[in-house]
C-alpha cells in the first residue's frame, strides 16, 4: 500500500488515465535485473528508480573510466576506478531511498543466471556482446519473464521486448547467429551520448509498461531509429519455427 508521501512523489504519473495506484503498487513490488550499467543501463536504472521500482539488481563487472563519462550518466568523475554496478547503485539510492538495490560486481555467466533470476520479474539487457545477450535470452525464456533489449551505436539504435511466454518471439528469433561484437561496441564504432540516453530511457519505459500492465509494450515489435535523421521504423517480428531457443514453446504468435 502506498503511503501519502509516495502518493505525492509519484503523483504525476498517477495522473495518467490508464496508470493507476495498482500499477504503481506493481512497480513497488517488482524486481528488475539490469545487466550492464553503461550508456544504456545508466538511464534505464535512473528512470526505473525514479518511477518507483521496488527492487533493482545491478550487474556489471567493469570499472568506471574517464571515457565512459561522455554518455554513462549514472557515474561521475569521483567514481572513476569504481565498479560500475557499485557506482550506479549509489546513484539509484540517492534518487530514491525506497528502492532496494543489490549489486553483482562480476560478469555474469550463463551457469549462474537461473539462480540469479529467481524472484526477478523482468530483465533489462544493456550489455554489449552477443554471448551474454544469448545467455540472458535463454534464461528469460526458462523463467518465463520479459527481456527488454536495446542496442545503440554511432547515431543508430533499436529496441524490443522479447517475451515468448506472452506469445512473442525471442532474441534468437531476430538474431539466430552471433554477429561481430565490435558492431555493438561504442569503443570501436563511436556513439553520440543522447542516442544511448534515449534508448536507455525507452528501455525503462518498456519495463514500466510490462510491470504495471500499462500501454502496449513492444512485444513482437522492433523499433529501429536513426537519430541522424530522426527516422523511426516499427517492424513486426515473427517467431521462428526453427529458433534454437524458443521453438519448443507452443504459445500463440502475436500478429
Where do the PLM segments sit?
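Adenine nucleotide-associated cytosolic modules
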Residues: 1-255
Amino acid at each position: 500500500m502506498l503511503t501519502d508521501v509516495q502518493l505525492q512523489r509519484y503523483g504525476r504519473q498517477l495522473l495518467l488515465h490508464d496508470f493507476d495506484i495498482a500499477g504503481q503498487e506493481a512497480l513497488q513490488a517488482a524486481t528488475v535485473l539490469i545487466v550492464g550499467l553503461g550508456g544504456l543501463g545508466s538511464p534505464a536504472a535512473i528512470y526505473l528508480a525514479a518511477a518507483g521500482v521496488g527492487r533493482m539488481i545491478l550487474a556489471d563487472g567493469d570499472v568506471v573510466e574517464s571515457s565512459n563519462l561522455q554518455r554513462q550518466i549514472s557515474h561521475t568523475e569521483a567514481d572513476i576506478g569504481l565498479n560500475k554496478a557499485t557506482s550506479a547503485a549509489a546513484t539509484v539510492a540517492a534518487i530514491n531511498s525506497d528502492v532496494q538495490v543489490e549489486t553483482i560486481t562480476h560478469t555474469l555467466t550463463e551457469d549462474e543466471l537461473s539462480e540469479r533470476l529467481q524472484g526477478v520479474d523482468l530483465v533489462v539487457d544493456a550489455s554489449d556482446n552477443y554471448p551474454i545477450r544469448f545467455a540472458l535470452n535463454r534464461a528469460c525464456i526458462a523463467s518465463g519473464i520479459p527481456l527488454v533489449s536495446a542496442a545503440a551505436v554511432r547515431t543508430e539504435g533499436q529496441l524490443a521486448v522479447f517475451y515468448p511466454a506472452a506469445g512473442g518471439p525471442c532474441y534468437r528469433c531476430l538474431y539466430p547467429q552471433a554477429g561481430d561484437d565490435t558492431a555493438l561496441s561504442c569503443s570501436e564504432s563511436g556513439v553520440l551520448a543522447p542516442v544511448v540516453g534515449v534508448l536507455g530511457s525507452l528501455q525503462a519505459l518498456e519495463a514500466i509498461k510490462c510491470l504495471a500492465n500499462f500501454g502496449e509494450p513492444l512485444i513482437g515489435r522492433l523499433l529501429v531509429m536513426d537519430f541522424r535523421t530522426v527516422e523511426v521504423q516499427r517492424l513486426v517480428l515473427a517467431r521462428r519455427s526453427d529458433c534454437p531457443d524458443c521453438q519448443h514453446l507452443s504459445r500463440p504468435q502475436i500478429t
